[in-house]
Amino acid sequence: MNNMAVRVRFCPSPTGTPHVGLIRTALFNWAYARHTGGTFVFRIEDTDSARDSEESYQAILDALNWLGLDYDEGPEIGGPYAPYRQSQRRDLYRDVIDRLIAAGEAYEAYSTAEEVEARHLAAGRNPKLGYDNFDRDLTDEQRAAHRAEGRNPVIRLRMPERDITWRDLVRGETTFGAGTMPDFALTRGNGEPLYTLVNPVDDALMKITHVLRGEDLLPSTPRQIALYEALIRIGVADGVPEFAHLPSVLGDGNKKLSKRDPQSNLFLHRDRGFIPEGLLNYLALLGWGIADDRDVFGLDEMVAAFDVVDVNSNPARFDQKKADALNAEHIRLLSEDEFTARLKAYFAAHGHDTGLDDAQFAEAARLVQTRIVVLGDAWGLLKFLDEGAFVLDERAAAKELKADAVPVLDAALAGLEGVGQWTTGAIEEALKKALLEDLELKPRKAFGPIRVAATGASVSPPLFESLELLGRDRSLARLRAGRDHAAAAA
């Protein structure tokens, strides 16, 4: 399939919350399609009605939309190989099963698990070896007798009795030896198709040329190649796609990142205030890199450079600190207007209200853009503007609002009460004169008590700008309250 236009697919099952490893797979498929000018197909594997949910499906759509990973064919938009939800394709699978049986590529198997184990034990083999291909050559009479007993068969593919080898685009030449892979089930006993059937059949019918997926699926590849070869022989498939098995994503302690690990949950990162650019940049580094000396890049740059053969086969560790640092870099790369819009949307989504008008909010955003790692950090710096959220940090107050802060705050109040236009420049001039010149204080000793009294914290946006945003009346009221707190602590 080397000469065909690239067609890749992202085919999650709609169960649970989107996992960062799943989204990494989507990103690599998307980037490869965009790099090659190919097609990115989005398909939903919803054949397990007991586990699949519409809520999870909507969550996957939400994730793709938020990250900007647009697909060319799939649910919601359609395409030449619709439908793109497997639950709507059962007639297609039934037809393929019938054709495989008619061609002798697959057969009905009636053995129970207990019977298979008993045969292994009788032959002196490990009873847990799995299916033993016993039903391959049942006669019509034997099959009829099983049906008369009320047994429902599963359909199994007849595996070739030879090595199966392929050149994995990430891992190189890979071989599974003859006899290591028993005939495998394509359906359940009730006739429902299994993932082992529907995934390769859909890839064949949708003309998928490259399968980029997690390495946990590597052991299933020889079975799928055998099925592709059978599908070619019955005229369903044009060829066997190329495979690329992406490295595992590890969490703490060299364990594979699981859905139980908080950092695996895509939406927890969004809720903290990751922006798509930062998260996608970090996910791209889980197995790939744009250059040895460069970690920060945009999606357009990734598309221009990405080739799946450059993906590293070694496991990748999810490092939250590095992810945070990259997100901070991308926040700084946003224009001031874009950052303001992102921050305003984030605050609205999380119920944060600064009480500022648009111009004031833009100024507040400018003050915090270079001081945060995730958008959520901005609320910690700006919540002093919300009277309902303002709290005096006890540790900061114990350090800054002691008896020696009383004359500092008295002088600050006297200086500020004479300010005409309440602007950053006028506030700065008044405070520096009252405290640095008149009281001859060092800046930290002068401004520490004012910062804590006005913002409630020892860390805030620049002090003079913060007081302008807070406004004259609230600033003076908080300084008075801070002075009273310091006097009471004396």
From Swiss-Prot:
Biological process, per Gene Ontology: glutamyl-tRNA aminoacylation
Q: What is its EC number?
A: 6.1.1.17
Q: What class of enzyme is it?
A: ligase
Pfam families noted in UniProt: Anticodon_2, tRNA-synt_1c
> Domain of life here?
Bacteria
Q: Which reaction does it catalyse?
A: tRNA(Glu) + L-glutamate + ATP = L-glutamyl-tRNA(Glu) + AMP + diphosphate
Q: Where in the cell is it found?
A: Cytoplasm
According to the UniProt entry, its GO molecular function terms are: ATP binding; glutamate-tRNA ligase activity; tRNA binding; zinc ion binding
Q: What is its main location?
A: cytoplasm
Disulphide bonds annotated for this chain are none
Which intervals of this chain are the motif 'HIGH' region? 12-22
The protein's UniProt keywords, in alphabetical order, are: Aminoacyl-tRNA synthetase, ATP-binding, Cytoplasm, Ligase, Nucleotide-binding, Protein biosynthesis
User: Which ranges belong to the motif 'KMSKS' region?
Assistant: 256-260
Instruction: Return the CDD domains for the record.
Output: GluRS_core (cd00808)
Annotated binding of ATP, by residue: K259
UniProt record similarity statement: Belongs to the class-I aminoacyl-tRNA synthetase family. Glutamate--tRNA ligase type 1 subfamily.
Function noted in UniProt:
Catalyzes the attachment of glutamate to tRNA(Glu) in a two-step reaction: glutamate is first activated by ATP to form Glu-AMP and then transferred to the acceptor end of tRNA(Glu).
Subunit-structure text: Monomer.
What name does the UniProt record give this protein? Glutamate--tRNA ligase
> Which gene is the coding source of this polypeptide chain?
gltX
